[in-house]
Amino acid sequence: MDKTQSRLRRARQTRIKIAELQVARLAVHRTNTHIYAQVFSPCGTKVLASASTLEAEVRAQLADKSGKGGNVAAATLIGKRIAEKAKAAGIESVAFDRSGFRYHGRVKALADAAREAGLKF
């Protein structure tokens, strides 16, 4: 089993447990250059809010700072944006789905920023 298969196996187990809880899910995906966050409905079929480093507003803000979307500063910005969008959609608490990635670095920065912005998990 390689690294990718191991990560996907961990992600699948997490999603099964979150589905049993029937709560909104904050899913995070990271690549070398970007980070993405989506809030899914409790049934898991609808995306209620999303934010990523590909958005034009985010890219403009990052151009002032570092110019890249694959760093902790970008993840912090995405965490704040996803929390604001989720709260605007009426979502106060979510289950955090790290998609099998380690809770470290950019994933942790996104989660901490979302918590500071008022999202509960």
Curated annotation (Swiss-Prot):
SUPFAM superfamilies the record matches: Translational machinery components
Gene Ontology biological process terms, A to Z: translation
CDD domains per the UniProt record, alphabetical: Ribosomal_L18_L5e
One Pfam family it belongs to: Ribosomal_L18p
Cysteine pairings via disulfide bonds: none
Keyword annotations of the record: Ribonucleoprotein, Ribosomal protein, RNA-binding, rRNA-binding
A GO molecular-function descriptor: 5S rRNA binding
A cellular component annotation (GO) from this entry: cytosolic large ribosomal subunit
Similarity comment text for this entry: Belongs to the universal ribosomal protein uL18 family.
Subunit structure as annotated in this protein's UniProt entry: Part of the 50S ribosomal subunit; part of the 5S rRNA/L5/L18/L25 subcomplex. Contacts the 5S and 23S rRNAs.
Function: This is one of the proteins that bind and probably mediate the attachment of the 5S RNA into the large ribosomal subunit, where it forms part of the central protuberance.
Name of the protein: Large ribosomal subunit protein uL18
Species: Paraburkholderia phymatum (strain DSM 17167 / CIP 108236 / LMG 21445 / STM815) (Burkholderia phymatum)
